[in-house]
From Swiss-Prot:
Tissue and organ expression note: Skins and livers of 1-week-old mice.
Quaternary organization: Binds to clathrin; involves primarily the C-terminal sequences, but the full-length protein is required for full binding capacity. Binds phosphatidylinositol 4,5- bisphosphate. Interacts with PIMREG; this interaction may change the subcellular location into the nucleus. Interacts with AP2A1 (via its alpha-appendage domain). Interacts (via N-terminus) with VAMP2; VAMP3; VAMP7 and VAMP8 (Via N-terminus). Interacts with LC3/MAP1LC3A.
Disruption outcome: PICALM-deficient mice suffer from severe anemia due to ineffective erythropoiesis in the bone marrow. In addition, they exhibit impaired clathrin-mediated internalization of transferrin leading to iron metabolism abnormalities.
Underlying gene: Picalm
InterPro entries: ANTH_dom, ANTH_dom_sf, AP180-like, ENTH, ENTH_VHS
Protein name: Phosphatidylinositol-binding clathrin assembly protein
Classification lineage: Eukaryota, Metazoa, Chordata, Craniata, Vertebrata
Length: 660
């Protein structure tokens, strides 16, 4: 038989379906393959015994179930697996086996399938008997003799007389069961029995070491014992001498099958004079006549016997010391490898973090090192040159925050880098800042009053500061109009001259689009006169003047002719401002714009110009007819369509409108 049988595969598949990994591993460890259980399966089962959530009785029952198989291979491998777990597994496993009344009932096992089955069945019966005795020994003394502490302060050397006389016979029974295996080197012909013999060999070495230490302790206390205790002790010692001979034969078989000679201990026989001294002492206690012997001679004989047995014990423990040393070296090698791996990981982590942290610093290091120190609390400097940052990020050889605008004038003289933000001339500084945002201009009066006359003109001025370059106090705060509101309402109403001056240094939001044509700087531009029938012209101011005139607000009077009753039919006689009467479709709801309340009015039906005025930029309402416009929040998107400015001279909110 070689390899796993079909029955083994079916059984393993059944356990896979049921989800029992332990039973599946037991099945794989005890297949029909003529070889010892595989190490990977044994290691897995050992680990299972160390897990608290593994059912130890279920594991043991699985092994017991495999011993009921008719094949000697399966039964033998089941016993080997059980023995391996008893020696190397968790102590819970052997505790459970010791608590059972019966373990392996294989005293009548016989495999009649072949000649090899007959031969192996004999060793199976002997092997099962030893495992049963091993479990019984654990039940009696509550510890495993192969795992007890050995040496001068070991368990067997420090045991008292009463307990010692009860414990040593238990060791003798277990040793007898082990030596009853009685295998020859010629019978170790397959891997299964070889695996069992190796486990028995290790148990024999450890068990005899404990046995030897118990005998040493017994001899040291023999001459102080009572008569009954001396009689029991003498009988134990005689059995010990007999078993030493059998143990020597067992070790010879181990040497013949190829076990290293260094792993086999040397057994030193005690002198024969010791047995005579023990018998004479017992006879003296019983009152028999013995030959004269001094206490000094007895002590000398006893010391010689103890030293010889102690040397035997040292030779027996030599294997364990080598195993211990090998285990320690292996653990040290693993620990060293783990330390090296950990040091490599720690060496990589700081390097990565430092590189990551240093990247932005190294990128901007040049700018940080070359940037001049700026004192924001310094007083304005009287230097005649403008401060310029030497670090040009884009190599454009210009100030870093220099605004890119058309016709930008130079910065004024006498200005520091940032100026004094806490100076007393904040108002003048605010007026001197270029108006880049139409909603950030300073209010010069009451917002509810009519628009001042000086708002209509664009004063000719040169900006005293550029954006983020510096703030210098201006001696005179000149009121100016917003750069975004380029509509001249006063000139349309006829209250002021139409001469305007274009600010060449201001910010051009629309790039010169929809602005009045300028002949030259500081040169007034008269408003072109258009025929009455042409509402829209190429000039923005003229177009607005015509549109406002058509709305009927050019005369500056307020229409208060509100009627609460149904008006009668009126005949229109015409006039310069006559328009066809068209019923209003809807009225705009009163809205608040910049804190100012304007009354309602209904826009008449008229032709809108192709381009919307740029005056009310930010109130983005598309021109639509027959619907109520929605008032939105002011924005800075200059490309949005704009709303016409409301009529500040319209009727009061809520009043009915009647057009003449």
């Amino acid at each position: 038989m070689s390899g796993q049988s079909l029955t083994d595969r079916i059984t393993a598949a059944q356990h896979s379906v049921t989800g029992s990994a332990v039973s599946k591993t037991v099945c794989k460890a005890t297949t029909h393959e003529i070889m010892g259980p595989k190490k990977k399966h044994l290691d897995y089962l050992i680990q299972c015994t160390n897990e608290m959530n593994v059912n130890i009785p279920q594991l043991a029952d699985s092994l017991f179930e495999r011993t009921t198989n008719s094949s000697w291979v399966v039964v033998f491998k089941s016993l080997i697996t059980t023995h391996h777990l008893m020696v190397y597994g968790n102590e819970r496993f052997i505790q459970y086996l010791a608590s059972r009344n019966t373990l392996f009932n294989l005293s009548n096992f016989l495999d009649k399938s072949g000649l090899q089955g007959y031969d192996m069945s004999t060793f199976i019966r002997r092997y099962s008997r030893y495992l049963n005795e091993k479990a019984v020994s654990y039940r009696q003394v509550a510890f495993d003799f192969t795992k007890v502490k050995r040496g001068a302060d070991g368990v067997m050397r420090t045991m008292n007389t009463e307990k010692l006389l009860k414990t040593v016979p238990i060791i003798q029974n277990q040793m007898d069961a082990l030596l009853d295996f009685n295998v020859n080197s010629n019978e170790l012909t397959n891997g299964v029995i070889n695996a069992a013999f190796m486990l028995l060999f290790k148990d024999a070495i450890r068990l005899f070491a404990a046995y030897n230490e118990g005998i040493i302790n017994l001899l040291e206390k023999y001459f102080d014992m009572k008569k009954n205790q001396c009689k029991e002790g003498l009988d134990i010692y005689k059995k010990f001498l007999t078993r030493m001979t059998r143990i020597s034969e067992f070790l010879k078989v181990a040497e013949q099958v190829g076990i290293d000679r260094g792993d086999i201990p040397d057994l030193s026989q005690a002198p024969s004079s010791l047995l005579d001294a023990l018998e004479q002492h017992l006879a003296s206690l019983e009152g028999k006549k013995i030959k004269d012997s001094t206490a000094a001679s007895r002590a000398t004989t006893l010391s010689n016997a103890v030293s010889s047995l102690a040397s035997t014990g040292l030779s027996l423990t030599k294997v364990d010391e080598r195993e211990k040393q090998a285990a320690l070296e292996e653990e040290q090698a693993r620990l060293k490898a783990l330390k090296e791996q950990r040091l490599k990981e720690l060496a990589k982590k700081p390097h990565t973090s430092l590189t990551t942290a240093a990247s932005p610093v190294s990128t901007s290091a040049g700018g940080i090192m070359t940037a001049p120190a700026i004192d924001i609390f310094s007083t304005p400097s009287s230097s005649n040159s403008t401060s310029k940052l030497p670090n040009d990020l884009l190599d454009l050889q210009q100030p870093t925050f220099h605004p890119s605008v058309h016709a930008m004038s130079a910065a004024p003289q006498g200005a520091s880098t940032w100026g004094d933000p806490f100076s007393a001339t904040l108002d003048a500084v605010e007026d001197a800042i270029p108006s880049l945002n139409p909603f950030l201009t300073k209010s010069s009066g009451d917002v509810h009053l009519p628009i001042a006359s000086d708002v209509s003109t664009f004063t000719t001025r040169t900006p005293t500061h550029e954006m983020f370059v510096g703030f210098s106090p201006s001696p005179v705060a000149q009121p100016h109009s917003s750069a975004g509101l380029n509509v001249d309402f006063e000139s349309v109403f006829g209250n002021k001259s139409t001469n305007v001056a274009v600010d060449s240094g201001g910010f051009d939001e629309l790039g010169g689009l929809l602005k009045p044509t300028v002949a030259s700087q500081n040169q007034s531009l008269p408003v072109a006169k258009l025929p009455p029938n042409k509402l829209v012209s190429d000039d923005l101011d003229s177009s607005l003047a015509n549109l406002v005139g058509n709305l009927g607000i050019g005369n500056g009077t307020t229409k208060n002719d509100v009627s609460w009753s149904q008006p009668g039919e009126k005949k229109l006689t015409g006039g310069s401002n006559w328009q066809p009467k068209v019923a209003p479709t809807t009225a705009w709801s009163a809205a608040t714009m910049n804190g100012m309340h304007f009354p309602q009015y209904a826009p008449p039906v008229m032709a809108y110009p192709a381009t919307t005025p740029t005056g009310m930029i930010g109130y983005g309402i598309p021109p639509q007819m027959g619907s109520v416009p929605v008032m939105t929040q002011p924005t800075l998107i200059y490309s949005q369509p704009v709303m016409r400015p409301p009529n500040p001279f319209g009727p009061v909110s809520g009043a009915q409108i009647q057009f003449m």
